[in-house]
């Protein structure tokens, strides 16, 4: 690792620990040349996921897009940012566990909605209204009826 201060390639590891639910290693290093301490992260190299969008175009999977959508859906709601990070991590690992290299944006949305429904139902409806592109209020109400019937079943 190059020192960010003097560009020396000679450093020693001072501390090492797991990060990101053991999917990465955080290392604290000290430059042997100038004594500067800096942090590096070692991540598992995973093959890229390709998202097939509704119009058929393909783009690289970006977890930040999921997180940004969740943040917008949960604005002014009692949802902690860490919960949104957890949902994003779970969705990404579910997709990678499926072993596919290409995944449709529809499948990603379904994964997100399944997890978000259990965190905050208002945020779920907000997310679903954008994701499912409701054409009118009737479609929105139909989606909400599904939530209400699920709640009644789980209350019994």
Swiss-Prot record:
Cofactor detail note: Binds 1 zinc ion.
Superkingdom classification of source: Bacteria
Keywords recorded for this protein, A-Z: ATP-binding, DNA-binding, Metal-binding, Nucleotide-binding, Repressor, Transcription, Transcription regulation, Zinc, Zinc-finger
PROSITE patterns according to UniProt: ATP_CONE (PS51161)
unnamed ZnF: 3-34
Molecular function, one GO term: zinc ion binding
Span of domain ATP-cone: 49-139
Family: Belongs to the NrdR family.
Function per UniProt: Negatively regulates transcription of bacterial ribonucleotide reductase nrd genes and operons by binding to NrdR-boxes.
Protein name: Transcriptional repressor NrdR
Originating gene: nrdR
